[in-house]
Amino acid sequence: MTNLRKNHPIMKIVNQSFIDLPAPSNISAWWNFGSLLGICLIIQILTGLFLAMHYTSDTLTAFSSVAHICRDVNYGWLIRKLHANGASMFFMCLFIHVGRGIYYGSYLFKETWNIGVILLLTVMATAFVGYVLPWGQMSFWGATVITNLLSAIPYIGSTLVEWIWGGFSVDKATLTRFFAFHFILPFIIMALVMVHLLFLHETGSNNPTGLNPDSDKIPFHPYYTIKDLLGFMLMILILMSLAMFSPDLLGDPDNFTPANPLNTPPHIKPEWYFLFAYAILRSIPNKLGGVLALLASILILIIIPLLHMSKQRSLMFRPISQTLFWLLTANLLTLTWIGGQPVEQPFIIIGQLASILYFTLIIVLMPLAGIMEDNLLEPKFP
């Protein structure tokens, strides 16, 4: 009898991707976040599907429909809170996944890395349009402020903003199209994930040492399937704890108030996972400059492979670069904190310094450290 797993056209692909896939024997827990992101995406699509069955994308009923889901739908409150906190888990895993890629030099798989950056941008867009849907105060004003940034584009800016709004302000047309985008984008993300994995399996996984692991590979199943399963259980435990015990911990209290175009909230701020970029945006006292800095803060990831100056791939054996990496991490946490603070001193100057340091670390200091470490390791004979 032929082995179905190895000969069936579909099972063969699954087998080569998740069962008989040769994987490096030394990949650590930092490599778990790819599979965790896959689980996050599945959770978000399933909870989102059930929410979409009861949600209405109309300005008059959107807020009430969300309240109805929480009050009257069986376990509607749980589905909604899993979806809201699932987004936070998604971004937590995303940031760690990208950080792992930078630390261990995974960005040298350029195709995989570039698709990953596109995925990050798509997930950010999905989260933004999704945040508008409950039609609370922060939903409405967040949408108004962020879409308004496009008006900084010379010549076509104002026309572009009105085109996206579908009118002269954020209104019914905007909400309806944002719901349409929020529904379709996760499926586009799924397709991109397939491409991401396709490119990854062309090269095989990187590993903590950054050395070629071909001499020592082990099958993905059972070694990494069981390891991923442990990751799933831990993540679902954290997500369930969040959704059950403190579902509103990461949300904004202003979103419990229905959207009111006549009343601006005292502090307009996005969800926690956008605060670092929001802080960079606000640190430049010029609209166009701020928008460009905001874009640069994410798009800088694309040029990271070009900034790799070291002969070693990973930071595992490079203490100076390691220090700079953790300084960058601390800097991003500082930016996240600043993004949630009001625009007043000392927060303004801290945000500006942190923004300058962010770009300096990535563009100047880390490449220089790579060159310096190479020179320090070079044997010097008299």
Swiss-Prot record:
One GO term of the biological process aspect: mitochondrial electron transport, ubiquinol to cytochrome c
Manner of cofactor binding, per the entry note: Binds 2 heme b groups non-covalently.
Topology with respect to the bilayer: Multi-pass membrane protein
Cofactor or coenzyme needed: heme b
Entry binding sites for heme b b562: H83, H182
Listed transmembrane segments: 33-53, 77-98, 113-133, 178-198, 226-246, 288-308, 320-340, 347-367
Subunit relationships: The cytochrome bc1 complex contains 11 subunits: 3 respiratory subunits (MT-CYB, CYC1 and UQCRFS1), 2 core proteins (UQCRC1 and UQCRC2) and 6 low-molecular weight proteins (UQCRH/QCR6, UQCRB/QCR7, UQCRQ/QCR8, UQCR10/QCR9, UQCR11/QCR10 and a cleavage product of UQCRFS1). This cytochrome bc1 complex then forms a dimer.
Function: Component of the ubiquinol-cytochrome c reductase complex (complex III or cytochrome b-c1 complex) that is part of the mitochondrial respiratory chain. The b-c1 complex mediates electron transfer from ubiquinol to cytochrome c. Contributes to the generation of a proton gradient across the mitochondrial membrane that is then used for ATP synthesis.
Note: Heme 1 (or BL or b562) is low-potential and absorbs at about 562 nm, and heme 2 (or BH or b566) is high-potential and absorbs at about 566 nm.
Protein name: Cytochrome b
